A protein has these predicted regions:
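Short beta-strand-centered segment that lines the nucleotide-binding/catalytic pocket of NTP-utilizing
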Residues: 55-69
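Short phosphate-coordinating micro-motif centered on Lys-Gly-acidic
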Residues: 2-4, 85-90, 96-150
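Phosphate-binding P-loop
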Residues: 22-27
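N-terminal pre-Walker A segment at the start of P-loop NTPase domains
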Residues: 1-18
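P-loop (Walker A) phosphate-binding loop of NTP-binding proteins
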Residues: 36
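Hydrophobic anchor at the beta1->P-loop junction of P-loop NTPases
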Residues: 31-33
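Conserved lysine of the Walker
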Residues: 41
Length: 150
């Protein structure tokens, strides 16, 4: 199953899809969350957090601080790079220790990583289908044959 495309009709359904996807994740995994503003990246992150036994109410987008850390079944590192002007700024939060650590890294606006982007990562692309519907496409670009289930 190289790529899965789904349509979500609500935030609750997006969180449920993310929760099912989270069952495929293991320590050291990096998940890129791509999409325009309001596409559902943080909602998807909340669904993963809930599946990792982190209260979804605690999860918010770390736009102004670059990263939040949540403790659950595994540590969850949630990056929001929207305001990042230079990938070198990530060194101030020692991002590589998190990316290659014992938890799961969720990265909103991953295109801002520039040359620091890890080769191995999941890609979750979210886009607006309508006001309430979202297209969700999940893949593992560096190994399209990596199997996962939803």
């Amino acid at each position: 199953m190289p790529e899965v495309s789904l349509i979500s009709d609500s935030e609750q359904e997006t969180m449920a899809i993310a929760g099912r996807f989270a069952k495929n994740l293991k320590a050291g995994d990096i998940v890129f969350l791509e999409g325009e503003l309001g596409a559902g990246k943080t909602v998807f992150a909340k669904g993963i957090a809930r599946a990792m036994e982190v209260s979804a109410r605690k999860v918010n987008s770390p736009t102004f601080i670059l990263m939040n850390v949540y403790q659950g079944k595994l540590p969850l590192y949630h990056f929001d790079l929207y305001r990042l002007e230079n990938p070198e700024e990530l060194k101030t939060v020692q991002f590589d220790e998190y990316f290659y650590g014992q938890g799961i890294s969720l990265v909103e606006w991953p295109e801002r990583l520039g040359g620091l982007s890890p080769k191995e990562h999941w890609l979750v692309a979210l886009s607006h289908k309508s006001e309430h519907q979202r297209n969700i496409c999940i893949s593992y670009p560096s190994n399209p044959q990596r199997k996962f289930s939803l």
